[in-house]
């Protein structure tokens, strides 16, 4: 992704953020040569807006609260910050990254592994749904960076398989989810085991005032890099709706879309596990090749589905919001909200899948007559315009 100065200046940051120095190239950050090589090898060419502002704040040891759009390189922002601070000569765990889902924790570990490819860095995804014995074995070998879910990481700390006394940095990714959905007590327990003065980095696509208030418990005089609310929705994503009137008419509408659009890969979001299973069954009956994923599935099944989807052997993934946060599949060009999300904050996480790293994407919302008010509410919440699908479907992709 090229650093687009003009596009970068279009992003509206809060007043306090405008005082933060911008580093327009990775070279200007004076990074380790091995890390710089890993960054370029991973495909980055220049920092995104959030990377150009936040990486150096993290490297300097400042507690940092960073908010940016999905797909703008938030994961790489803190990963580069972590890798800059790691002493690979030591076997100690020096950084913990906590995420709300297993898939996101694995994705982060994968990014860290690739960016640190030339650094001899050791990292491990410590997540629930896997054998405890596998974690113990890996942790005993010594891991510099651990990316995990709060429950499993806390369990490993209590078992003394993770020794947090040398941890320099704690990262809370998708902080709005972590701090509001039952993880708060686990995170605070983990935080209390860390050395005094450990750096805390808080990252999310959306940060409500309530979540920002909660971060006071974990941070000390943090630098805040926040975008204005009306810039949270991704630039470059075309947003449309189709008025289906009745729930029963949505499926036929979906089939019509697939008959008329050329789609690389797509994600279809439903609000319940039951509907995911039902819709997958209906599409298979209509000879569509689809995969389905939700939180009730075994971890190995979810891993297998994600592997197939990333490789491109499956072109359509039907999912609940378990997939909405942070899972990066570069080829996704279309997101369809079969149901509007129950939580407005999830809208940006869902549609962000279709425009990764500046590529153009399309989001289509299927509406019943009862969804009209919710659509207006979404548009007001994000200060965005969601247009009706034009008669000529070739114009929307």
UniProtKB/Swiss-Prot annotation:
Residues 55-225 form the Helicase ATP-binding domain. Residues 236-397 form the Helicase C-terminal domain. A motif (DEAD box) lies at residues 173-176. A motif (Q motif) lies at residues 24-52. Its main location: nucleus. Its EC number is 3.6.4.13. One of its GO terms (cellular component) is small-subunit processome. GO terms for biological process: maturation of SSU-rRNA from tricistronic rRNA transcript (SSU-rRNA, 5.8S rRNA, LSU-rRNA). One of its GO terms (molecular function) is ATP binding. ATP-dependent RNA helicase involved in 40S ribosomal subunit biogenesis. Required for the processing and cleavage of 35S pre-rRNA at sites A0, A1, and A2, leading to mature 18S rRNA. The Q motif is unique to and characteristic of the DEAD box family of RNA helicases and controls ATP binding and hydrolysis. Belongs to the DEAD box helicase family. DDX48/FAL1 subfamily. This is ATP-dependent RNA helicase FAL1. It comes from Meyerozyma guilliermondii (strain ATCC 6260 / CBS 566 / DSM 6381 / JCM 1539 / NBRC 10279 / NRRL Y-324) (Yeast).
């Amino acid at each position: 992704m090229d650093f687009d100065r003009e596009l970068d200046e279009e992003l509206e940051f809060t007043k306090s953020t405008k005082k933060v120095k911008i580093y327009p190239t990775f070279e200007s950050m004076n990074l380790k040569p091995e890390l710089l090589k890993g960054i370029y090898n991973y495909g980055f060419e220049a920092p995104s807006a959030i990377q150009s502002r936040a990486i150096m704040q993290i490297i300097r040891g400042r507690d940092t609260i960073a908010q940016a759009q999905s797909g703008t390189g938030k994961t790489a922002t803190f990963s580069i910050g972590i890798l800059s601070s790691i002493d690979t000569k030591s076997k100690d765990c020096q950084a913990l990254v906590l995420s709300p889902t297993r898939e996101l924790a694995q994705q982060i570990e994968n990014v860290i592994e690739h960016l640190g490819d030339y650094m001899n860095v050791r990292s491990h995804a410590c997540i629930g749904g896997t054998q405890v014995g596998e974690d113990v074995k890996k942790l005993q070998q010594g891991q510099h960076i651990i990316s995990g879910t709060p429950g499993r990481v806390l369990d490993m700390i209590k078992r003394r398989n993770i020794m947090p006394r040398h941890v320099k940095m704690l990262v809370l990714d998708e902080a709005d989810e972590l701090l509001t959905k039952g993880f708060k007590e686990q995170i605070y327990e983990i935080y209390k085991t860390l050395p005094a003065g450990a750096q805390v980095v808080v990252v999310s696509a959306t940060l409500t005032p309530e979540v920002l208030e909660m971060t006071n418990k974990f941070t000390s005089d943090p630098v805040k890099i926040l975008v204005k609310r009306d810039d949270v929705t991704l630039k470059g994503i075309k947003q449309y709706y189709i008025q289906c009137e009745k729930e029963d008419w949505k499926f036929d509408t979906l089939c019509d879309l697939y008959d008329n659009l050329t789609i690389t890969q797509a994600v279809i979001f439903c609000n319940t596990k039951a509907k995911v299973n039902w819709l997958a069954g209906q599409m298979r009956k209509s000879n569509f090749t689809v995969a389905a994923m939700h939180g009730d599935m075994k971890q190995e099944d979810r891993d297998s589905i994600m592997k197939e989807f990333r490789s491109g052997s499956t072109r359509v993934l039907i999912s609940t919001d378990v997939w909405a946060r942070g899972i990066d599949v570069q080829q996704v060009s279309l997101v369809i909200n079969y149901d509007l999300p129950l939580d407005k904050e999830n809208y940006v996480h869902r549609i962000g899948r279709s425009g990764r790293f500046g590529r153009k994407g399309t989001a289509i919302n299927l509406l019943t007559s009862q969804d009209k008010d919710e659509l207006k509410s979404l548009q007001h919440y994000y200060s965005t315009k969601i247009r009706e699908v034009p008669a000529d479907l070739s114009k929307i992709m």
